[in-house]
Amino acid sequence: MADLRPVMFTVPGEPVGKGRPRIGRVAGHARMFTPAKTANYEGLIAHSGQQAMAGRALFEGPVLVELDIALSIPQSMSKKRKALALAGQLHPTKKPDLDNVQKAIYDGLNGVVWKDDVQVVKAVVGKRYGETPGVRVKVVPLLEGEQ
């Protein structure tokens, strides 16, 4: 029987949004490649996911994903604004975009936590300021017919 316990872990460091694929030329032929910053971040995501899975089998059915994206507070913020940011009363309207971080997390977990990110049928995603930057990830396997 499949292990239906949720998997929870944190991807440390400043969150990075998924970069657009770039096109370069190799021996006269166009070649697409993922930007190095994106590839490095997806590697960190995969490593964090592997540690959390601890040898468990990949989820094969539908999953719910919860992402809590914490961005560092800019040094230029006043003490008053920093306190508001940490209290959740000031929201980060700066890069990286929430959806691009979400894409990077999903792609980094392909073949690590689930077979493919098409299995994500429900997501709860938020972006906030935090003392420690990073992304808290929770993946919950769903049973067929479960909402």
Regions found by a protein language model. Give the residues of each.
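Acidic, proline/glycine-enriched N-terminal capping motif
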Residues: 1-147
